[in-house]
């Protein structure tokens, strides 16, 4: 790596408000890879995108604030290359600068990126000697900087991508049983493929959140004005039938916390007591008790989706108890724990508990597609 030019694909798609970064998680996660390459005296050329400029230059989506943040964190000068990539013909242009860390301007300013254009990828590959993908969260996209560049250069995974794939393998292929999945979210249709793929490998699948309301209603109970998805009985039947065949237990709430509105006071109810003007906003104490016992008896746990409307502290108790129980087992080295999904990560951030899990994925779509058993273009390209 010494003095080699490393094309490093990162996901620096951080939330920006008026040129200010509001959450630096994605930047913090890739610092080990950057520091490793700096230590090896490599020249680093970073490729990333922010937002959806759709192949046009959008000033508000420049990587300039990200360069400034990287500069602060690395304590090193970081140069933003604003030149049109398509007009840079050779890698020697990097030698004109003294810096060791370069960032090419938003790769999605070029329509060729999302079109997975082979010629565009070849042009970019001319700038480097080696390609490294440390953007697991973008690896479900067949885009030029993810899928095509590896055709032109020796290509490797970055440290963060490696961690992510190894952690996900421990819940999909190299499993220590008993293994439990706690899965939530508002729509079954967005998680059906994950559930179907996991049933044959898992001992327990615990359904919480808005999705659980469909199960509660399917088994003959009133869910009032609760959030639920329409027309999904067929999906439920499919889940129930596969789980029986594969001897995987499907668990849904036995009691619930309801209120008349999102800001109302919480009330604990049995499933047959929910009134038509009430909404289910969390799991009840009996359900919490059941879930914590299952966690105690598990060796591996995957958590994707809070148990209730955790944004209101009145309805966050179920999710907090799940988090506490997983952390307790983690600290005692009794469990391997993986969590992922925007709301789950947000909840763990609120509890300052992100580092209390073996692995917390911030990868969103790529995380779910991996759990669905799909091949991710970025991983396929590296293989």
Language-model-detected regions and their locations in the chain:
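Active-site loop-to-helix "anion-binding N-cap" substructures in soluble metabolic enzymes
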Residues: 1-383
